[in-house]
Amino acid sequence: MHGLLLAGLAAALPLGVAGLPARQQSGLSPRGIDINAYRFASMAKYSEHKTTSQMVHSFSYSKDDDYVATATKLVKSTFPNMTFRTVKDHYIGTNGIGHVHFKQTAHGIDIDNADFNVNIGRDGKVFTFGNSFFEGEMPKTNPLTKRDFSDPVKALHGAVKTLKIPVKPESAKAMPMKEVETFKFEGTSGALSEPKAKLVYLQKDGNLHLTWRVETDVGDNWLLSYVDAKESETVHNVVDYVASADYKVFAWGLNDPTEGQPTMIKDPWNTTGSGSPFTWHGDGQMDYTVTRGNNVPAQDNPSGGSQWENNYRPESAELSFVYEYSEQMEPEQYKDFAITQLFYTVNTFHDVLYTLGFTEEAGNFQMNNNGKGGQGNDFAICNAQDGSGTNNANFATPPDGQPGRMRMYTWTTAQPSRDGDLEAGIVIHEYTHGLSNRLCGGPANSNCLNELEAGGMGEGWGDFYATAIRLKQGDTHDTDYTMGEWAANQKGGIREYPYSTNMQTNPYTYADVQGMSEVHGIGTVWATILYDVLWNLIDEHGMGKNIMPKFVNGAPTDGRNLAMKLVLDGMTLMPCNPNFMQARDAIIDADQALTNGQNKCALMKAFAKRGLGSNYKHGKNRVNNFDMPAGC
């Protein structure tokens, strides 16, 4: 699986998916009420950059305006007869784009699902914008004048009854808050905080409806229920702040369909640390109901073309990505399952690497870096069943600030054909090209693994991470693993030897690189050495049972994650276009920095076993050295 390096890959197009006005809802509630039956309809429009630049080229700017003033002018010029307010959450992102949000009003009352967002570029001009403003007939009279609407307590009763919310409202009293027609309810029980209500308009079916927005947080659901302000038994729409998602996939650690069955996994980002603060389906600006988020947009690409933004993705309003797969099906028949699997694998690996040090500042792949450094705007574009090739896969890694691109192909070596998206090792191998190219030489330089030996290590790192992750509880130092065996339908896999600590099973040493002229062969030697490193550290520290490592003083407590951490840290230390010896030294240096060198002997035992001993001298001819350093 060649990791294609395209340093000149164009930057991502502006986002073109209209977002709903709140986070995704969680589907069937524990009370048997289908919350999704009350979802908002999507009404937003979005003008991407190319269209925007053509539309607003004659827009009047003043060099004295700040980005908020410029954004406000655009809204006024677009809807000159409408009223709105500026939401107090504007900011300039790390990419230099200013973000300003507006809320439409009628008679001073918010239209709760009528928004306008404007993004201002570094040059002070409108970059992109979107809106869901109501353009129908406005109410002629101010409801606050006649006050012909129900008491908010009735709205609370209506929401509780209709949606079976476990709140007892019998003794509720509405206490006014600072905002106009906003109340909190005292005397209730069952909620985690006092319920609230606010009078708002809601656009639905081409009309405005006056409603009480009743807020109830009961843990499993945190609902905003839009109760009709005159007929309290009518609930127009519901928003649930609690984001929940289900995926039917081969779970993390299962390399391919031969190792287990697909299972249901719920909200996996809850178990993968802080790498995905917006969950896997949000980017801090929008929430998505498809296989897209801050880290990954995953889609099919049967044409093999360069366009990806509008390609097909599985969609689920309730974020339930549950699809069927069987080995008798052709890949096209299970593309929803394959895209979901790709989305799950890449997101999980992103989060694992994040905890190990592949963060925003290190150049990781995220659209929104959330103010934590790095360039952002560079998630990993992942194409499933890409039609540009077969029997392979690739990953393009431009410098930080430009998206990576993964192309996963189907394999025609079996009948029916097999989809590489279902072999996690292939996906992990490809994503690791992004890791190594961003870390070696720094995030801004993707040209540091171009030399033959360095390029070979790039391939080897991919196999190493893929193999380390697929280890199972009960595996031992004597367990062997192949690479690509399932997808290729080839017993023994696609490498010359399986990864093994047994010198009879895999006899590779560093001297074997001498006669090689292709990166995958060199990579197999490097990954073989690292497989010995991996098992030496597991023998010392154990394997660990959790997806995410536990840390003491910054070091993973188990050997598997410690090995992955040291290899990752080593990438950040080694020079541009390193050789094996320099990479060996960088890993040892990484251990010195992390653990004060506690694992030096375990590391050197692995390197020396495969010919990179302490007295190895790099030269034109690669001659093995099996010496251990003094003290070991």
From Swiss-Prot:
Gene Ontology BP, a term: proteolysis
Keyword Transferase on entry: no
Residues with glycosylation annotation: N270
Binding site residues for Zn(2+): H429, H433
Compartments it resides in: Secreted
Required co-factors: Zn(2+)
GO cellular component: extracellular region
Co-factor binding details: Binds 1 zinc ion per subunit.
Disulfide cross-links: none
E.C. numbers: 3.4.24.-
Keywords, comma-separated and alphabetical: Glycoprotein, Hydrolase, Metal-binding, Metalloprotease, Protease, Secreted, Signal, Zinc, Zymogen
Family: Belongs to the peptidase M36 family.
PANTHER family linked to this entry: EXTRACELLULAR METALLOPROTEINASE MEP
Annotated function: Secreted metalloproteinase that allows assimilation of proteinaceous substrates and probably acts as a virulence factor.
Protein name, as recorded: Extracellular metalloproteinase 2
Originating species: Arthroderma gypseum (strain ATCC MYA-4604 / CBS 118893) (Microsporum gypseum)
